[in-house]
Amino acid sequence: MRKVKPARKLGRTSAHRKATLSNLSTQLLIHKRIETTEAKAKETRKVVEKIITKARKGTHHAQREVFGALRDKEAVRELFEEIVGRIGSRNGGYTRIIKLAPRYGDAAKMAVIELVDYAEAPSAAPVVSKQDRAKRVKGSKKAESRSQENEGGDAAE
């Protein structure tokens, strides 16, 4: 009896799926953080975790295996020279997935996948002071009437 493998197909053929996951993995290793759909992020995590574990061996054979999966010299160099050194003694769990709001347009579930040791501390959102709408909208009747009142009020004092 045929059994289904526990993996997402992502609506693609096997070759297209493999290329997509390879490209997402490459971009994650180069940029340290990417935004994609939740399903792609979860599948990318599986690939990246295995690649980083192989890279931790540091052998020439491991480097060739990783290059076979990524097909990008820059990403392989970044992985072996910088990422592996920074990860150090961490045993797995190299990535983190943060769920985001649904994408506008098709309401697809979105997520950010990032390398754990490269996560930036969240910065406080800039405080924006509210202005009177009449001041923001040039040429509005309210803005003109208020400016005339202020001019008239200055003359009375």
From Swiss-Prot:
GO terms for biological process: translation. One of its GO terms (molecular function) is structural constituent of ribosome. It holds the Pfam family Ribosomal_L17. The keyword Cytoplasm does not apply. Residues 124-157 are annotated as: Disordered. InterPro entries: Ribosomal_bL17 (IPR000456), Ribosomal_bL17_CS (IPR047859), Ribosomal_bL17_sf (IPR036373). Signal peptide: none annotated. Keywords: Ribonucleoprotein, Ribosomal protein. GO terms for cellular component: cytosolic large ribosomal subunit. NCBIfam families: L17. Belongs to the bacterial ribosomal protein bL17 family. HAMAP family: Ribosomal_bL17 (MF_01368). Part of the 50S ribosomal subunit. Contacts protein L32. This is Large ribosomal subunit protein bL17. It comes from Chlorobaculum tepidum (strain ATCC 49652 / DSM 12025 / NBRC 103806 / TLS). The lineage of its organism: Bacteria, Pseudomonadati, Chlorobiota, Chlorobiia, Chlorobiales.
